[in-house]
Amino acid sequence: MLAFAGVVHIPWSVPKPLQCIVAVARNGVIGREGKLPWHIPEDLAWFMDQTAGGVMIEGPACYAELGKALPGRGTVVVSRDPAKSFPGAERAASLAEAIVIADRMDQWPGPVWITGGERIYAEGTPLCERLLITRIDRDFEGDRFFPADWQKLFTKLVSSKAGEHEGLGYRFEVWER
C-alpha cells in the first residue's frame, strides 16, 4: 500500500484553505488504467458541487480522465513534462508550485482542492485541513491507491447515510484535522 510522500515545502503561508476530495474503494483503490473503476453519478455530483468555485490540483491522468478543465473552477495540473499542455488549466512542475499558483487564482476564491491521482494525494493529503471522501463499499482491482495511513491525520466529523447505485454501496464522509 502507498504511504505518504516526503514533506512538501511551501515558500510562504497560503491563505486559501487546502482540502482533499477522493473516492476510495474498501481496499484503497482509487484508479485502474487511468480511470475510475466505478461509475456513481451521485459521487460525481458531490465532487462537482464541492469543488465549484475553488481550484483543483491534479495530475495528468486525472485531467485526462475528466477530458478537460472543468467549468466553474480553476485547474492546475502537476506535470514534470514542460512540453505538455493542458487546455484551460495552468501547469506546475511540482505540488508546491501548484499550490502557489492556485492560491494566486483570485477569480476562484473557494478552497484549493487536492483531487488526485496517487502521487498528488500522497504529497498533498498531509497538507490538507479537511478531507472529503466517498467510501465505496467494495474491493476493486486497481493500480492506483490512496495512502493507507490517512486516518492517522484526520478525525471524522460527519458521515452520510449509505447510498446505493446499481448495487454498489457508498457513503460520503467529511474528516478534519
Where do the PLM segments sit?
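Enzymes that bind and transform nitrogen-containing heteroaromatic metabolites
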Residues: H9-R177
